[in-house]
Amino acid sequence: MIVFGGEDRSDLFLPDSQTNEERKQYDSVAFEDVAVNFTQEEWALLGPSQKSLYRDVMWETIRNLDCIGMKWEDTNIEDQHRNPRRSLRCHIIERFSESRQPDSTVNEKPPGVDPCKSSVCGEIMGCSFLNCYITFDAGHKPDECQEYGEKPHTHKQCGTAFNYHHSFQTQERPHTGKKRYDCKECGKTFSSSGNLRRHIIVQRGGGPYICKLCGKAFFWPSLFRMHERTHTGEKPYECKQCCKAFPIYSSYLRHERTHTGEKPYECKHCSKAFPDYSSYVRHERTHTGEKPYKCKRCGRAFSVSSSLRIHERTHTGEKPYECKQCGKAFHHLGSFQRHMIRHTGDGPHKCKICGKGFDCPSSLQSHERTHTGEKPYECKQCGKALSHHSSFRSHMIMHTGDGPHKCKVCGKAFIYPSVFQGHERTHTGEKPYECKECGKAFRISSSLRRHETTHTGEKPYKCKCGKAFIDFYSFQNHETTHTGEKPYECKECGKAFSCFTYLSQHRRTHMAEKPYECKTCKKAFSHFGNLKVHERIHTGEKPYECKECRKAFSWLTCLLRHERIHTGKKSYECQQCGKAFTRSRFLRGHEKTHTGEKMHECKECGKALSSLSSLHRHKRTHWRDTL
C-alpha cells in the first residue's frame, strides 16, 4: 500500500486493468526507473546548489519507496556485477556523495534508517537506498565506479564514451528512438516504466503533493516547492551582477549565461550554440522536423509542449491572461504583453515620426509603413499591394479559398480557428456569450466585451484629442481622421478608405454581392451587421436605452443623437464661422451656404437647392399650384 498523508494512493501508480503480475514487474524495477541520473557531461555543469537539490530529491524518492516496502532483487553474484542497474545504483551513490557537505561520507547512516544486509557479496543496503552506506566485496567490483579512468562503454554512432552502462543506455535512446512503455489511456510511449507511472499520475490529476491554493498536484516535492513560489512570489535566486531574482535555480543559471556568454550546448548540424539544454533540443527539431506533441482534437503537431498547450486553448476557448483596463483576454502571455503596450504606448521600439512605442522591431516596421506608404507584399494574381504580411495572407485566401479552416455551408476559408468558429455561428445562430446585465447574447466574446461597456460607460482607448473609444480598432480608425491617411484603395473606382473593413463593405457595391439574407422578408445585405440592424424592424427589438429618460432605440446612432438633446452637446462645428450642430448632415448642409454648392435640383423647374429638405419644401410650391 502506498500511503501519503494518511491516504491510500496506490491507485495512482498503475491503471486498474493491470494484473498483479504486471504490478510486480513494475515494482521490481521501481528504484532504477524513478532514479534521476545525469551523464558525466551533464553532472560537470551542475553547481553546488543544484547538486544539493539533487540530493534532496533523491532522498525524498527513496523515502517514498521505503513507504511501500521496496526490496532489491537478490540474483547471483555474476548477474549482479553484469547488471547495468546495479552500476546505476553505484553511479548515483557516487554522485550523491559528491553533493553532500565536505565533512560527510557515503558510509554515514542517516537517522531513522535500518540497513538490511544482503546475502550477496557482503553488500549492505538500507531500504532508503541513497540514505544508506554501501560496501562492495573486494573480489567483485562493478564497472569502474570512479569519476576518472577507463570508460568502457562507447557509442558507435556519436563516439561518446561513458563510465557507466546506464549513461550509455541513456545516450543510446535518442539514436535508437526506442520507447518501450505505452500508456493505455492516451497511447503515449515512454522509455522507462518510472516515466510512465509519473505520466499516469499527472494524467489523472494526482500526485502526493497538492497545492492548497489551486489544487494542482505534483509528483516531486521540489517541483511542488517551485510551484508554491508562483503564489507567494518568492524569488530566492538573485543574480549578483544585475540583482534580477528568479524563483527557480535553472532559470537563474540560464540568466547568468547572458552575462558570461556561455553556451555549452552546440548543434552538430549547424554548430549553433545554446545556453540551456531545452533550447538546444527545440533547435534540433528544426533540423529533424520532429513534432512529438500532437493535438487530440485536430491532429496538429508541435515541436514543443508549450506550443501545444497554447494551441489547445483555441479549442477550449480558455484565455487565462486578462487585461484589467479593458477586460480583453488572451490565449498566451506574449499577446497579452503586446496588448498592454497599446494602453501604455511605452514599448521599447519608438517611431521617430510620431513617438509611438512598440513591443518588437517588426511591429515598429509595420507601423512605419503607415507613414511612408510602403506596401512590400504584392499579390501576383491581381497586383494588389499590402503593407502587412497578415493582410497579405488573408487577401490570398480570397483568391485561393484554401485556408486551413473552411466553412462547409458557404465555402469561405479562414486562417485562424477562432475567426472560423465565429463565422460558423452566423449560420447556426449560436450565441454563447451572454451579458449578465441585460441577458443579450453574442456570437463572439469581443462583441460581448464591447456591449458590456454600454453598461459601464468605460472607454479605455483615448486619443490625444480627448475622444475615447470602446475598442482598439475604432480608436485606430479615428486616428486616421487626424493624419488623413487612407491606405485602403478600391481598384474599381479609386475611392480610398481609412480601414480595410470599410473597403470590404464598399467592394460589395461593385460586385453586387449580398450574402446575408433576411429570413422574414428575404431582403439581402452586403454585410452581416446591416442584416442584424434590419432584423430589428421585424422583431421590434430596441436594445439601446437612454439612461436619462429611459427611451429605447433600435440603433446606437439614434441613441447617441437623442442623448445630445439632454447634454446639449454639438460635436460638429463649422470651421469657417464656428457654428455647431448636433448631427453631421446638418453641418454638411450648413457648409453649402459658404461654398454656394447646390446639389439638389428640382425636376419641375430646374431650380437648384443646397439641401434635400429645402428641395422638399420647394416641391410643395408646385403641388399647391396644381391644386
From Swiss-Prot:
Cellular location(s): Nucleus
Documented effect of changing H590L: Found in a renal cell carcinoma sample; somatic mutation
Domain KRAB: 29-115
InterPro entries: KRAB, KRAB_dom_sf, Znf_C2H2_sf, Znf_C2H2_type
UniProt-listed Pfam families: KRAB, zf-C2H2, zf-C2H2_4, zf-C2H2_6
Domain of life per record: Eukaryota
Function: May be involved in transcriptional regulation.
Family affiliation: Belongs to the krueppel C2H2-type zinc-finger protein family.
Protein name: Zinc finger protein 442
Protein source organism: Homo sapiens
Taxonomic lineage from the root: Eukaryota, Metazoa, Chordata, Craniata, Vertebrata
